[in-house]
């Protein structure tokens, strides 16, 4: 039996905030770049990127497989093409519109088997020539090659030819009581059994020819044919389903790696760095990390980000500063890299180290819904409460101006209580905010577990859109006033 698992996602559930992640982190842009218009690749990528659970072992397993796929990209793309074309060909050639008719089931299943047996030969050829080294792809190759060889394929092709019944259905039966036919057994036609010499040497045999106008007789023969093929139909249909499931499973598993190959090509085209994330407890470090969705939108390399934090337990990265300084873009870049890292993929950075494989949550601004019976601040609190219900130690929460829909004093108090509780619970927080009171109190209280990033401004006032470590300054007072006080 062929068994393999290229993804090792198990029965992992989708992330609780999957829709928010797609929207806030612009993941659909990344998926579109990886899929290249292939809907199956897009579907599998959304599924893997938005997994709630990701263990260090599963991440390492997929990372090794991604590296292997990139080294053997021709083999992976060829296998995916074979699986895709096979599934499509079977869908075009097989029409089981009467599943209870044994004759039709055998005929249609054989149509599909003929296609798939030929494709198996192509799969074997690719696997024999490939040089896979990862556990995932070596396991797949071994399972296929251990169960399928040239002898098996030759036998399968011969069986398909026999099941065509080009010379009619040959079978034997026992004559039971009252001359009732019993125990039909399909017979394998003898080789050369229909040539002239064999007919000349054949002993006398009883032959009954049905009159062309005998409709009742034709119905009886049709019923006999169905009766004889009933058991065979079940076996043939199981074989068809088994092979069809193999090709569907193969192309779905490979789709993830086809997307990785496509995205790698995109990185090369734009000159983006590609790093495979490392896991190091208590450390968050990245250098020259780019916002991938922005790069996709602009077709260029945007301003990169750097950070190096060494702490035990939860911590907070707080970002503040003037509008249009790259703060939200930074938040998206972090979130995208975390999601890619958990999927076992490379990220757009020279280096990327994360402290845990926890789940990622986002709390970004939403347009006010006029149909709600409560205000915008209540909506923010309600949405954040839903996030808190699923949080665990080691998870990540990305907050973009959360709780800013109320006044500065109330917003600062709520923000301080929330962020402090998250950090104390071992959660990693990234928070973009203008709340000056919160910044002063929280950073003083959590100076060992928090870092403040501000947009870099040169001496001549030019903004570089890079973020550097800093401290709250009154220089952003006008921006804050415009944000919260202007009406």
Regions from the PLM with identified roles:
Residues 95-289, 293:
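Conserved P-loop NTPase architecture
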Residues 1, 22, 257, 453-457:
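Assembly/interface hotspot detector across virion components, adhesins/toxins, and nucleic-acid enzymes
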Residues 75-86, 217-227, 444-447:
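An acidic intrinsically disordered interaction segment
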Residues 1-172:
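Conserved amphipathic alpha-helical "coupling/scaffold" segments
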Residues 26, 198, 447-449:
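Active-site regions of enzymes building and remodeling cell-envelope glycoconjugates
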Residues 281-487:
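ATPase nucleotide-binding head domains, primarily ABC-like/P-loop NTPase cores
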Residues 51-91, 174-208, 343, 424, ...:
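An N-terminal domain-start capping segment
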Residues 91, 233, 385-389:
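Regular secondary-structure segments
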